[in-house]
Regions:
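Conserved anion/nucleotide-ligand pocket segment
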Residues: 180-261
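Glycine-rich, aromatic-lined ligand/substrate-binding cores of catalytic
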Residues: 232-314
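Short internal beta-strands
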Residues: 73-80, 160
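Glycine/threonine-rich flexible loop motifs
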Residues: 131-143
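Conserved functional hotspot residues or short segments at active or partner-binding sites
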Residues: 287-397
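Glycine-rich, charge-decorated loop segments at or immediately adjacent to ligand/cofactor-binding or catalytic sites
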Residues: 84-89, 158-181
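Bacterial Sec-dependent N-terminal signal peptides
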Residues: 1-26
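Glycine-rich oxoanion-binding loops at beta->alpha junctions
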Residues: 92-122, 134
């Protein structure tokens, strides 16, 4: 009986993998690299910056694929670690990877930038992480800082491209302003930038946008190669790619979570204001608090007639985080027309409604949280102007003011 059960599990796993392969319409960069015989890596000592999202369509880790086919000599860990076992903001330690025995150099510990010593002994640095398409997610900052060190040492960088889960058409939010460059706002790009990570790497490399963590260093340009996907189109949802979703970080468990992140993440910078689904099963997918009347908030938001957005009253009890173990009430939101929906303004409509109904002002919280909110926004204009009346109309023109120019610039780097 034991052997029969084991065999059944093996057959089920094989069927799942076969199904994934059959349904995949898009080949990620790691598969294209493999099809090309690992061109550019043969005979070289290879370093790999990755996390659990670096897999092929059969869920095989890029670590394993490279270790079997080229001379993989070192791993580099972004936020959450190479194996994804570190919580958001948690310090990642350097050490050895238990599975492979390879040295792991932390890029989210005592330093955020690879040191020359860390890169000693490699001939090329490969990057393979699933991006989420939003400027404040730290993986793209980690990539840029690593590109800077590689440039100074003459080490080439190879980016294995992956789909942008927000698609390649959605661009929203202002560019980062001087004085607000930070690890969560490292480049002068919109909050949602509509590029794959490979396209973004080319843009920051060629346009002189890679100016260090605080945006005040001379731009540098590394020797960059992007291994493109095959079959991806800018209009695709992630589900249409046919690729399995492996969460790039603990609070992005589903493709929808990546879409919701820029819709609620700014509100998440205000501790003890609204729960945004973190600590429950819908991260970045809701706005709730003990003192909210869910039906009242839904009615107020419905009255705004936000294009492409529908609202549903919800009640839930977070397991941890803000309002942990307390019954809270609020709204969950849905995109009925993603193309027209202003996804990054959703959170501001919620703040407007909450202020109109309950006079709750998140900017009365600690200066530290306001500072972080401004850094993620890339400017203090939003907090200053929005707080005056809590009206989305007061910031919407500013919020979209850089989009057209950035679209024109970024088209130069479209691979797809």
């Amino acid at each position: 009986m034991l052997y029969r059960n084991i065999l059944r599990h093996i057959l089920c796993a094989s069927a799942l993998i076969a199904s994934l392969v059959a349904s995949a319409r898009v080949k990620p960069g790691i598969e294209v690299l493999r099809d090309r015989g690992f061109e550019g890596l043969q005979g070289k000592r290879v370093g790999l910056l990755t996390n659990p999202s670096g897999v092929d369509s059969q869920l095989r880790s890029t670590i394993d694929i490279l270790a079997e086919n080229v001379n993989l000599v070192a791993l580099y860990a972004p936020e959450h670690g190479v194996r994804g076992d570190i919580w958001a903001g948690g310090k990642v330690e350097s050490g050895k990877d238990a599975a492979t025995g390879l040295p792991v150099h932390s890029l989210y510990g005592s330093t955020r930038q690879a040191t020359p010593e860390m890169l000693k002994g490699i001939d090329i640095l490969v990057y393979d992480i699933q991006d989420v398409g939003t400027r404040s997610y730290t993986f793209i900052s980690c990539l840029g800082l690593t590109m800077r060190t590689c440039a100074s040492l003459g080490i080439p960088v190879m980016v294995l491209d992956r789909p942008n889960p927000l698609g390649g058409l959605k661009v929203e939010g202002p560019l980062v302003r001087e004085g607000y460059f930070f690890y969560v706002s490292q480049y002068a790009i919109p909050y949602v930038y509509g590029l794959t990570v490979g396209e973004l790497a080319m843009l920051i490399n060629d346009e002189g946008l890679n100016r260090g963590q605080k945006g005040n260093e001379d731009p540098v340009r590394c020797r960059l190669t992007v291994v493109p996907m095959e079959g991806w189109e800018r209009s695709m949802t992630y589900e249409q790619t046919g690729l399995p979703w492996v969460m790039p970080s603990p609070n992005i468990p589903y493709p929808r979570s990546a879409i919701c992140y820029p819709s609620a993440g700014l509100v998440g910078e205000f501790n003890n204001y609204l729960n945004i689904g973190i600590g429950y099963t819908i991260p970045f997918d809701a706005f709730a608090a003990e003192w909210i009347d869910a039906d009242e908030l839904k009615a107020k938001l419905d009255s705004y007639k936000v294009p492409g957005v529908a609202w549903r009253a919800v009640h839930y009890t977070p397991f941890y985080g803000s309002s942990a173990k307390k019954l809270i009430h609020g709204v969950q939101y849905y995109y009925t027309d993603y193309e027209t929906a202003p996804i990054t303004l959703v959170q501001f409509y919620v703040m407007q409604a909450v202020y109109e109904l309950y006079k709750k002002d998140p900017f009365e919280l600690s200066e530290n949280r306001i500072s972080m909110f401004n850094k993620v926004c890339g400017t203090d204009f939003v907090s200053t102007e929005f707080r005056k009346r809590f009206r989305v109309a007061d910031i919407s023109s500013y919020w979209s003011g850089d989009v057209a120019a950035f679209r024109a610039l970024s088209r130069k780097y479209y691979i797809y």
